[in-house]
């Protein structure tokens, strides 16, 4: 969980303009602070369901992480769904307004990924497409939504580790070096993967990932 912090940073690095200088500012559509508020408010709205339901069903989630049958079935169901999701949902429009209601709906659909074996990215992308976002816009918002969601999960796990007296494990032996190295590798690989993924799904859709 700690290593995924590198992947979180990769999203911010790739989309730093979206996080710190939204397009609506350049076009003069909104003032800087209005654009920033709208962007981050949508992230907060989309994250709230995961926070609430994640805390409520934390015991169920952790107790089923090792349920091989459940994970296996969910991978199969998710894969089949991805094979046909491009046909199920009509192509989104670039003119679709990304409202708070749409952000909240995507946030709730993201919670399906709390079932072990369900991909968080898949659930949020499908959520975006169900709200008539384009494949690219849905995929990008999935990555944006991963930042607060994964950061929160990382902080929670570190807190649990420290509160149970395991904080010394972070610095024991070569653990700290391993975590730092793992985070750097995750950062680099995530940047390459995100670039490839966005370009691929924009052109070809999600069927190949369903087979995967």
What are the residue ranges of the model-derived segments?
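Multi-pass membrane proteins that catalyze or facilitate reactions on polyprenyl-/lipid-phosphate substrates
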Residues: 1-212
């Amino acid at each position: 969980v700690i290593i995924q912090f590198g992947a979180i940073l990769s999203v911010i690095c790739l989309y730093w303009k979206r996080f710190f200088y939204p397009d609506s500012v350049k076009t003069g559509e909104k003032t800087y602070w209005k654009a920033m508020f709208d962007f981050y408010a949508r992230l907060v709205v989309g994250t709230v369901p995961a926070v609430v339901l994640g805390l409520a069903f934390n015991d169920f989630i952790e107790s089923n992480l090792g349920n091989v049958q459940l994970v296996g079935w969910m991978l199969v169901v998710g894969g089949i769904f991805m094979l046909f999701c491009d046909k199920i949902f009509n192509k989104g429009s670039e003119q679709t307004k990304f409202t708070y209601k749409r952000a909240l709906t995507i946030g709730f659909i993201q919670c399906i990924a709390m079932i072990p074996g369900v991909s968080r990215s898949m659930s949020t992308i499908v959520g975006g497409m169900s709200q008539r976002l384009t494949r690219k816009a849905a995929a990008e918002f999935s990555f944006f939504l991963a930042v607060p969601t994964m950061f929160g999960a990382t902080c929670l796990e570190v807190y649990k580790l420290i509160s149970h007296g395991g904080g010394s494990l972070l610095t024991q032996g070569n653990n700290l070096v391993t975590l730092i190295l793992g985070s750097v590798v995750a950062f680099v690989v995530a940047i390459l993967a995100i670039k490839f993924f966005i370009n691929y799904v924009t052109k070809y859709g999600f069927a190949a990932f369903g087979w995967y």
